[in-house]
């Protein structure tokens, strides 16, 4: 049986992640409150942040920035794109 959550991002019941995304209190909070669909949305948003801000994920300060953005994306006011960002046209 799938792990179901009341997703904080989608505002509805949805299938959750198979396991916490990382071993921490935040990872457990995401596992309990974020759907797999919303997590996929975050990974796309994170890619945009990495590219637009030219982040280097092995640098501690860039990791901290991404964690702050993740918390805002799921549990705060939301994570915004840089002002210069132009979404790709499909």
UniProtKB/Swiss-Prot annotation:
Name the GO cellular-component terms: cytosol
Q: Which UniProt keywords apply?
A: Iron
- Keyword match Ligase: no
GO process terms (BP): cellular response to oxidative stress
Any one Gene Ontology molecular-function term assigned to this protein's record:
iron ion binding
Family statement: Belongs to the Fe(2+)-trafficking protein family.
Q: Which Gene3D superfamilies match?
A: Fe(II) trafficking protein YggX
What is the name listed in the Swiss-Prot or TrEMBL entry for this protein? Answer: Probable Fe(2+)-trafficking protein
Q: Which organism is it from?
A: Koribacter versatilis (strain Ellin345)
Q: Transmembrane region positions?
A: none
One of this protein's Pfam families, by short name?
Iron_traffic
Question: What does this chain do?
Answer: Could be a mediator in iron transactions between iron acquisition and iron-requiring processes, such as synthesis and/or repair of Fe-S clusters in biosynthetic enzymes.
């Amino acid at each position: 049986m799938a792990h179901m959550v009341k997703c904080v991002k989608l505002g509805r019941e949805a299938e959750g992640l198979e396991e916490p995304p990382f071993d921490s209190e935040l990872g457990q909070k995401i596992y309990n409150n974020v759907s797999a669909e919303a997590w996929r949305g975050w990974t796309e948003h994170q890619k945009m942040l990495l590219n637009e801000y030219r982040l280097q994920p092995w640098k501690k300060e860039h990791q901290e920035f991404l964690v702050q953005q993740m918390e805002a994306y799921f549990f705060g006011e939301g994570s915004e794109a840089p002002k210069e960002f132009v979404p790709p046209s499909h």
